A protein has these predicted regions:
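Two-component/phosphorelay signaling modules centered on CheY-like receiver
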Residues: 13-31
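The feature encodes the CheY-like receiver
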Residues: 16, 58, 86
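Acidic catalytic/metal-coordinating carboxylates
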Residues: 34-35, 61-64
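Active-site beta3 strand of CheY-like receiver
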Residues: 47-52, 57
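Short amphipathic alpha-helix used as the core "switch/output" element in two-component signaling
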Residues: 63-73
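Alpha4 helix (beta4-alpha4-beta5 surface) of REC/receiver domains from two-component response regulators
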Residues: 64, 85-100
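C-terminal output helix
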Residues: 106-116
Length: 122
């Protein structure tokens, strides 16, 4: 499997470590940050293939950030992982360029399925 570059953006450090540890085992190249400001810097420098993005971060909403990322870097795939899962949230996610939506709490098999879908989507 070719190693894919994944950026994890979540303010919950335990979730970041959990995702990183499990993704590293599956040969993904990962790193994580805890704010949108840090995420923007890494995206500008390294252009990850996939962004695993929480919606509620200390410096803003992931949905708003996703819209900007998709405008500037349309090739970046975005998987939103959030505890806020209402029909309105899913509609907003779809409109803002989210490629896949996962509700917290989640299982790693959901994350692996999401990555498989967005990476292999034609």
């Amino acid at each position: 499997m070719e190693m894919e570059n994944v950026l994890i953006v979540d303010d919950e450090v335990d979730i970041c470590y959990f995702l990183k540890r499990n993704l590293d085992r599956k040969e993904y190249t990962t790193c994580f940050v805890n704010s949108l400001k840090e995420a923007q810097k890494l995206i500008d420098e390294d252009r990850p293939l996939v962004l695993l993005l929480d919606n509620h971060l200390p410096d803003g909403l992931g949905l708003d950030f996703a819209e900007k990322v998709k405008r500037d870097y349309p090739e970046v795939k975005i998987v939103m992982i959030t505890a806020h899962d209402t029909p309105k949230d899913r509609i907003s996610a779809n409109r803002n360029g989210i490629d896949y939506f996962i509700s917290k709490p989640f299982m790693m098999k959901e994350v692996f399925r999401a990555l498989d879908v967005v990476i292999n989507r034609a």
